[in-house]
Amino acid sequence: MFEHTTVLLKETVDGLNVKEDGTYVDCTLGGAGHSEYLLSQLSEKGKLVAFDQDETALRHAKEKLADYEGQVVFIKSNFRYLKDRLNEIGITKVDGVLFDLGVSSPQLDTPERGFSYHHDAPLDMRMDQSAGLSAKEVVNEWPYEDLVKIFFKYGEEKFSKQIARKIEKAREQSPIETTGQLVDIIKEAIPAPARRSGGHPAKRIFQAIRIAVNDELRVFEEALLQAIEVLKPGGRVSVITFHSLEDRICKSTFKDMSSPPELPHGLPVIPKEFEPKLKLVNRKPITASEEELEHNNRARSAKLRIAEKARE
């Protein structure tokens, strides 16, 4: 069963300031928790477009949202094609967009998907299982320098060089096929004192490989700009991130687009075209309450940022 506990449910959807006859986009349908709550606030004239590139997630979401048939358009696509896919169904402007980034619990909990360092499974990590690049290719075929680069950049792993060197030596003997093999190699490469602190030793490397396989940061950066573009003035975008790399992209995009430009002193008024495109709804990110954390520990690293479109 595709069981998934939705993070920051009310905060994310209520933050969109939902209009009952509005058009909304859920870029990360997943377990459909946010979508279901959003749809419950729409009248029959309201509409939701729901994106997911995971076939299993879409199938379960269609069952879960069966009561709203006719109001939901399901799109199997990476959200980097947000604007194009909306154009294809005749939608150019929307009232709100939401992103809930990171891997959904069912993907983590299904061993054969290869996302989890707790289960031995084939190295995969593709969000879209019809996509080309898999974790197995990254681990076995990418040169040492490229592995160091992604481990450091996407995993913020201080033992990147040691781990990449161990991977290189191991794959010379035979291909690294499973998550279990990779975990053992990582553990061997990290000094014992460091292994005993700071969570699971493979956590950062698995995150780095997953980001590389799915091109997550670039995809999010592109999609966030498209989301802001398709918003009507007064429309809002809610973004939940789970690690500092994504949060940095969201924070800097929102900051850049909500800050007035440097203008010559003495201008009586700011010309309209120089006014910021966005207005921040919350200056500091919203995090999960103690009550939510008791029920869902995965919400611990979640940060929610919301912005409103001020002008075209």
Curated annotation (Swiss-Prot):
SUPFAM superfamilies: Putative methyltransferase TM0872, insert domain, S-adenosyl-L-methionine-dependent methyltransferases
Keyword terms: Cytoplasm, Methyltransferase, rRNA processing, S-adenosyl-L-methionine, Transferase
Residues annotated as binding S-adenosyl-L-methionine: A32, G33, H34, D52, F79, D100, Q107
Ribonucleoprotein among keywords: no
Function: Specifically methylates the N4 position of cytidine in position 1402 (C1402) of 16S rRNA.
Name the record gives this protein: Ribosomal RNA small subunit methyltransferase H
Predominant localisation class: cytoplasm
Enzyme class label: transferase
EC numbers: 2.1.1.199
Region annotation (Disordered) ranges: 285-312
Pfam families given in the database record: Methyltransf_5 (PF01795)
Origin superkingdom: Bacteria
Signal peptide (UniProt feature, chain positions): none
Species lineage: Bacteria, Bacillati, Bacillota, Bacilli, Bacillales
GO biological process assignments: rRNA base methylation
GO molecular function, one term: rRNA (cytosine-N4-)-methyltransferase activity
CC terms in the record's Gene Ontology section: cytoplasm
HAMAP family, per database record: 16SrRNA_methyltr_H (MF_01007)
Reaction catalyzed: cytidine(1402) in 16S rRNA + S-adenosyl-L-methionine = N(4)-methylcytidine(1402) in 16S rRNA + S-adenosyl-L-homocysteine + H(+)
Intracellular or extracellular location(s): Cytoplasm
Recorded family membership: Belongs to the methyltransferase superfamily. RsmH family.
